[in-house]
Design a protein with these regions (language model features):
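N-terminal low-complexity, intrinsically disordered segments
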Residues: 1-31
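Polybasic, proline/glycine-rich intrinsically disordered low-complexity segments
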Residues: 10-12, 57-100
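Acidic, low-complexity, intrinsically disordered interaction modules
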Residues: 32-76
Length: 100
């Protein structure tokens, strides 16, 4: 099982599977230290405290993707902390067994 952190989700990340999307409260957000980063934007990665990694991810059954969905607009260039009025909505994407 691999646990990822990303700033977006694409249907191209999964071959024909059922998906479960769960919105997380601030208390339930993951510890980013143990996650594989697939955050493709440098400023978003800096704010989240993870390395920027423009990698292709194909999720498999048992994998989990934690999506940090930016709220408030685009981050200013070179941003390393969240500006006032910005935040992240956290969503856990879980891959279920194959659909036939």
């Amino acid at each position: 099982m691999t646990r990822y952190i990303g700033n977006a989700f694409s249907l191209g990340m999964v071959p024909r599977h059922l998906l479960a999307f769960v919105r997380l409260s601030a208390c339930d957000r993951p510890d980013v230290v143990d996650l594989v980063s697939c955050v493709g934007h440098a400023d978003t990665a800096a704010v989240l405290g993870v390395p920027m990694a423009r990698i292709s991810v194909t999720l498999q059954p048992g994998d989990v993707l934690y999506v940090a969905q930016l709220r408030g607009g685009r981050l200013p260039e070179g941003c390393v902390t969240l500006p006032e009025g910005f935040g992240f909505d956290w969503i856990r994407v879980e891959i279920e067994p194959s659909v036939r």
